[in-house]
Structure formats: structure tokens, C-alpha cells
Amino acid sequence: MSFVVIIPARYASTRLPGKPLVDINGKPMIVHVLERARESGAERIIVATDHEDVARAVEAAGGEVCMTRADHQSGTERLAEVVEKCAFSDDTVIVNVQGDEPMIPATIIRQVADNLAQRQVGMATLAVPIHNAEEAFNPNAVKVVLDAEGYALYFSRATIPWDRDRFAEGLETVGDNFLRHLGIYGYRAGFIRRYVNWQASPLEHIEMLEQLRVLWYGEKIHVAVAQEVPGTGVDTPEDLERVRAEMR
């Protein structure tokens, strides 16, 4: 099964300026992500960026670049520009790998592509079980609840589902019903074309979760449990130091 990986790599970052190019053990971060994507068996890998310095780093590592506008409001909008520039057919399977995930396992890139290809749905993603209360109550850990067939009912920064009886006894433990959403998505190219024409939903603005737009318009997102748990992503200088230590 063939699929394409697109890696959005926006240069500007409030907490970590020039984030795609930060050095991790002798290589720019975006090159580490590119290497993980190559291990997935993708037919084609494209880094979508708005900055020439990022493009040069990727091309120096033998990667393909698509220059995109700097004014996109989301990573999916950047994907849509690449889809149009590359004229992908509507049934092309595209995996969106975040440019700040240098430790992402290649197995889960492949998994989300396979997951999408096996279903008549426009979008698929992954999640991992939550086993501790700190993560369950952390608004930066996005939770997802599923229906009986593994389709998302809702994504939230809140603690869902709310375990009434257990939480009434204290917050020290959580049960086995919590899933943390991972920020990796598989799409069919035709779905991306439709998505970017939808208006943002009220729920999306409240939670600041772009995927809620899909549910708002009555579409389905399939969610599988990831075969591997990805390593630390890089959002802050502290994350960067942690990743450097873990990747030594």
C-alpha cells in the first residue's frame, strides 16, 4: 500500500524560534523527522515549509521540499496547499507527520496509513492509553473517547470520560478508559480538499483543537491504539534539552 508523508515545518515559533532548525546531536530537528519518515516505507516524503533556510537544510539531506505560504492558520491548510501544488489524486493516502517529532517511531507512521487504507473514511489517527492521573487531568494532553467501532465521539482537553465514582474517592488513580490523542493524521487527499472549505466550528475555537471541525460537520475519524508510544515532542527549550539527552 503506497502513501505519501507530508511534514509541515513552520519556521516561526513563539516558544522556540527557528524550531525546525534547532540542533539535535549534530543535525537539524527537521532532518531527524525526515529520517524517521524514510524508515516508514512511504512512497514519497515532502517537507512543507515557508522558510528558505529550512528548505536548504532538507535539500542538503536529500529531501524534497514544497515551499508554502507563511500565512496559513493551521498545519492542515499547509497540507492542502501541497496537495494542490502536487496535484495528488483524491484517493491518495497522505500522512501528516509533525515537524517537531524527531523521535516518532516509523511503525506508527505506517500504522496510521494502513489504518486509513483499510476503511472507507476520510481521516484516521492514533491514541495511547493513559495510566496516571497527572496526564488525565493535564489540559495539554488531549483526550479522545471512541464508539464501539473505534471512531471518535469527541476530543477534549478536559478529562473525558469523567469517572464519577472513582474521582469522587480522590484523584490519585485512573481506570483503563482513558486515551491520549497523538498528533499524527492520515487523510485521503480529497478529504483535505473538502476540509479546508469548511468554516471553523465553535467547538474548535473553544478547545483549540482543529480536528473537532471534522466531527462538527458529521464526518468520522477512525482512532487506533498506537503500536508504539512516541518519544518526546519539542515545543519548548526544556523539551529540546530532554530530547537531546534521550537521543544521545
Swiss-Prot record:
Tell me the keywords, alphabetical order. Answer: Cytoplasm, Lipopolysaccharide biosynthesis, Nucleotidyltransferase, Transferase
Q: Do you know which SUPFAM superfamilies this protein is assigned to?
A: Nucleotide-diphospho-sugar transferases
CDD domains per UniProt: CMP-KDO-Synthetase (cd02517)
| Enzymatic class | transferase
Pfam families assigned: CTP_transf_3
This protein's pathway: Nucleotide-sugar biosynthesis; CMP-3-deoxy-D-manno-octulosonate biosynthesis; CMP-3-deoxy-D-manno-octulosonate from 3-deoxy-D-manno-octulosonate and CTP: step 1/1; Bacterial outer membrane biogenesis; lipopolysaccharide biosynthesis
Disulfide bridges in this chain: none
What the record says about family reads: Belongs to the KdsB family.
Q: What is this protein called?
A: 3-deoxy-manno-octulosonate cytidylyltransferase
